Amino acid sequence: LRHKVYGYCVLGP
């Protein structure tokens, strides 16, 4: 998953 949260990617690149 590439969800960008608060400016960074979470749960994977």
From Swiss-Prot:
Keywords: Antibiotic, Antimicrobial, Apoptosis, Fungicide, Necrosis. The keyword Hydrolase does not apply. Induction: Up-regulated by infection with E.coli. The keyword Nucleus does not apply. GO terms for biological process: apoptotic process; defense response to bacterium; defense response to fungus; killing of cells of another organism. It comes from the Eukaryota. Antimicrobial peptide which displays antifungal and antibacterial activity. Has antibacterial activity against the Gram-negative bacterium E.coli ATCC 11775 (MIC=64 ug/ml), the Gram-positive bacterium S.aureus ATCC 25923 (MIC=64 ug/ml), and has antifungal activity against C.albicans ATCC 14053 (MIC=64 ug/ml). Has antifungal activity against C.albicans ATCC 90028 (MIC=5 uM), C.parapsilosis ATCC 22019 (MIC=5 uM), T.beigelii KCTC 7707 (MIC=2.5 uM), M.furfur KCTC 7744 (MIC=5 uM), A.flavus KCTC 6905 (MIC=10 uM) and A.fumigatus KCTC 6145 (MIC=5 uM). This is Periplanetasin-4. The lineage of its organism: Eukaryota, Metazoa, Ecdysozoa, Arthropoda, Hexapoda.
